[in-house]
Amino acid sequence: MKTALVHSDAWQRFDYGPEHPLRMERLGLTWRLMEAYGLTTLPQATVQAPEPAPERVIASYHAPEYLDVLKAANGGVAPRGAERYGLGPGDNPVFPGLWDAARVVAGGSLLAAELVASGHAARAFHFAGGLHHAFPTRASGFCYVNDAVLAIRHLQAQGLRVAYVDIDAHHGDGVQ
């Protein structure tokens, strides 16, 4: 059975700005390194491109008023009151395409979960995922939409049990 490599160039739309510590070009560098080592063309690998997660799926965890703010911020300008939702200068800046990019990342985690759950892949690697600090009503720790929670809930809705093992340097507080 194959390993699914979930990849999209749309992840490059996450542009936190030149002074932000999270540099999303690392995703492109990672992909090019995987290509250089031949990992993306191995017979046991399959490259899968995600679709944006449907808003109704994102709304299964995130509050409607928070999603309204994310959508309003998609043009690159923070709407009035955005700071109440964790948006603004610092950890979670507003940038053009914020909502669109967050939906693609969430879609990648949902795709990875579904490929494994359905038996179409033995494992899946979604290296843009794991934005585990977003809360139902606010962004936190560079995370706008909690793709980990969405994938876990997707699997649980199918009656599957999930063990979430987080090996990040700090606590994935949006998942608890």
Residue ranges and their predicted role:
Residues 1-176:
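HDAC/HDAC-like amidohydrolase catalytic core signature
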